[in-house]
């Protein structure tokens, strides 16, 4: 048979073999076109599982009359024009194959109208050469696509279609995934004239959980942990189910990259690894996660159905997702403090905190604008997803809006710098008074005066923190309101002390975090001997180095070392351990090794922001309380404010 150019219809049918797998594929391609057109409402009508009819109607920008013929042509698109556009795709579609492929295996009709046109136009392709016919029609601004008799001219493909129920189930799943990706778009789904799904638009973030609950169910919502992390151009947000909820939701895995639904193995591996031993091998995590990344750093043109992507910095993306999910799960599983009085069993009244903005572990994330804390120790009974960073005690009674207002008022500093409990919330000392009702009136009055004095003028001995961060003096010094005075604190020194504590192993040792790509280490024979000699010590520090036949492979490191230059750090570590081997009577102490590594770690910050300083000091107060009580001179310096005051006095 001689070489010849295939007819357009046959070429399109071959292309349809990859694009149009089943009716659900048609729905996906057409709905994504509607989203690219800026539609805010999409109506989907299905008959007989999509075999008889698929109709997609939207209120997008529409297609002009002059472009209708090109819309049904192969490799014709308005999404990209140059190779540079292909390397930074921001639209759902970009190949220009969908409509041509679908029209070659069905009877497709395209009706559209733009806002500039006074009437709509309808186009359809037919014949061996796929000639396009255009005629006037009645239609509002937007586009309607009708796909009739799918695979009518390809009997082999039609034979492999499943039952009507099965095909509609696949369509329903596609619509669910799209509805989770675009909360701002209203979507309705009809099957055989019956309304099956109606997803109302949720333009406000406060309404996201309503759609999340309608798609994922109440079980997922009750076990959901909110995720919100940022690092450079990488942002991840969404929800993951705690291990208990994940065991009940085996098929709840939704992941999106720049609002594009994905089934990417790298992302799935990072999330699965974050759960680690909390799920068995046959169990799957449950999550709805949204990854935002610079379009130049991801290639979406690597899969026929665009269900997989290729990241230019795969290791960075993997570690970022892993750290975000793992931190949320660790915070949720952290032990809770007993917040009840031992005698009465009643919840302790709200008490003053030393820092309103204490403690969320951001991955170089700018501060949030939300000021309302939430308390969610276990799955909320109200059906609202928990905020992972604020997991704590949840009273038996549901958390009320009034309590939220009272608590926020408690955190607001007064003019004299002290926080006064609002009405309805007892001060810390009033709990003792309430538990001892049999007092005389005189004793009660004296006690109240003493309590008032304690609230208005807290003793210095009661201060267990660094005080309030007033500002940050560039690049790395924090000005503090400390012990009724002003103090300068070195943030790099505080960070070093914190890393020493984080790197000091407990009895169980530090948890090893597996690397996405194990690193081969080029070492001499003597260096390999050092690794073998101190293998137990390194394992206790969470450093997993596999030595075999004169080769070494670094497979895991503890969390504080993940972002370091591991090749250089391990080389310096071997030299440090080798120095100890030269003196036979000395052994490496874990505390000394932790201090040494902390001095070698590169700081993640060069120019500190106010929120980062608050976060660091909150972590230091929590993990190194002794530093706040008796700070060393290299960490904190008290300023003499009296000289400045004298300079302002004019006799």
Swiss-Prot record:
Organism per entry: Pectobacterium atrosepticum (strain SCRI 1043 / ATCC BAA-672) (Erwinia carotovora subsp. atroseptica)
GO function term, MF aspect, one: ATP-dependent DNA damage sensor activity
Residue ranges the record marks as coiled coil: none
Annotated transmembrane regions: none
Compositionally biased residues, Polar residues: 385-394
Protein's gene: mutL
Region Disordered, annotated ranges: 336-398
Protein family membership: Belongs to the DNA mismatch repair MutL/HexB family.
Matching SMART domains: DNA_mis_repair, MutL_C
Name listed for the protein in its UniProt record: DNA mismatch repair protein MutL
